[in-house]
Amino acid sequence: MTIADNKKAFFDYFIEERYEAGMALEGWEVKAIRANRAQIKEGYVVIRNAELFLIGAHISPLQSASTHVHPDPVRTRKLLLHAEEIKKLIGKVEQRGYTLVPLNLHYTRGRVKCEIGLAKGKKQFDKRETEKDRDWQREKARLMREKA
C-alpha cells in the first residue's frame, strides 16, 4: 500500500533502476506516517560514509505526540540496504553521473519502506517531449471515447 508518491521524480529524471530500502524511523514518525502525514516531493538521497540517507522528506508530527520528544519534521533519516546494493549504487553515482531519488513510501509486511530510484537528470527538451507525449496520449484517448 502506497503512503506517499514522488510524481515530480518521474518528470525530472529518467529512472533506470529501483531499489527498496528500509528506513530507520522514530516512534512518532511511524505514527505520523500511518496517519498519512508524510511528503517526499522535496526529498533526495545522499551517500555518506558508505551509508544512504534520506534528506528533505517531511513528516509532520502529530499533535498528540509525547511532551518529552521534540520532533524534527525534516530530519535526516538513514536508509537500510544490503552492503552489495550500497556498493553498486556508490559506484554508479560517483562515476556515471547518476543520482538517487526517493520514488515512494509504502508498507511491506507492516514495515515502512522507501523505494529509491537510480536516475539520470532530464534536460529541458526531454521534459517538453515527455509533456507532448502525455498530451497526445490524453488527446488520443479523448478521440477514441468520442468515436465509441
From Swiss-Prot:
SUPFAM superfamilies: Small protein B (SmpB). Transmembrane segments: none annotated. InterPro entries: SmpB (IPR023620), SsrA-bd_prot (IPR000037), SsrA-bd_prot_CS (IPR020081). It is found in: Cytoplasm. The keyword 4Fe-4S does not apply. GO terms for molecular function: RNA binding. Residues 124-148 are annotated as: Disordered. One of its GO terms (biological process) is trans-translation. Keywords: Cytoplasm, RNA-binding. The keyword RNA-binding applies. GO terms for cellular component: cytosol. NCBIfam families: PRK05422.1 (NF003843), smpB (TIGR00086). Required for rescue of stalled ribosomes mediated by trans-translation. Binds to transfer-messenger RNA (tmRNA), required for stable association of tmRNA with ribosomes. tmRNA and SmpB together mimic tRNA shape, replacing the anticodon stem-loop with SmpB. tmRNA is encoded by the ssrA gene; the 2 termini fold to resemble tRNA(Ala) and it encodes a 'tag peptide', a short internal open reading frame. During trans-translation Ala-aminoacylated tmRNA acts like a tRNA, entering the A-site of stalled ribosomes, displacing the stalled mRNA. HAMAP family: SmpB. Belongs to the SmpB family. This is SsrA-binding protein.
